[in-house]
């Protein structure tokens, strides 16, 4: 989402700087730290993933989450069969199983993630995919922007007051 938001803003550098400033230059190292800080009251707002926020909600926490107006990205989980696999038929059967409606439902519920199937509804409390402000950027543009975002974020993390 950071990359998509950066692409949707006038200046990626200014966007990162303002975000870091709003976070008091405190950069946590994991979504678990964000969740813990929200639950114990250290933070009233946290920047995290949809799955992490949904985990809090499904666990009964009184939290909500939003997506950046500038946009976000949806990177779906993937499964593959290795070329030259000595057990190709079994691997393809497992692939079919992982993509089945039942398996996708189990994964969505147990991991608070979205199904890769378009015919499987989002879990309770999650917005349908068509309502998300998804970036229209391609993978090459997103990859380049991610590298820039990482560099700018490291610079912001090293500024006065950084964690």
What residue ranges belong to the model's regions?
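Extracytoplasmic ligand-binding site segments that recognize negatively charged/polar headgroups
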Residues: 1-42
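Periplasmic-binding protein-like
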Residues: 16-20, 27-28, 59-83, 97-120
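Extracellular/periplasmic bilobal clamshell ligand-binding domains
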Residues: 122-163
């Amino acid at each position: 989402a950071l990359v998509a938001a950066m692409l949707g803003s006038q200046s990626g550098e200014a966007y990162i700087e303002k975000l870091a400033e709003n976070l008091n230059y405190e950069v946590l190292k994991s979504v678990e730290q964000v969740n813990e800080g929200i639950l114990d009251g250290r933070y009233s707002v946290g920047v995290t993933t949809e799955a992490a926020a949904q985990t809090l909600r499904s666990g009964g926490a009184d939290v909500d989450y939003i997506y950046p107006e500038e946009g976000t990205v949806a990177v779906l989980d993937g499964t593959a069969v290795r070329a030259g696999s000595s057990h190709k038929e079994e691997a393809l059967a497992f692939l079919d199983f992982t993509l089945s409606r039942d398996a996708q439902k189990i994964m969505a519920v147990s991991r608070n993630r979205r199904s890769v199937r378009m015919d499987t509804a989002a879990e309770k409390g999650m917005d349908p995919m068509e309502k998300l402000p998804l970036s229209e950027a391609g993978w090459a543009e997103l990859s380049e922007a991610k590298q820039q975002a990482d560099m700018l974020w490291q610079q912001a993390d090293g500024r006065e007051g950084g964690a």
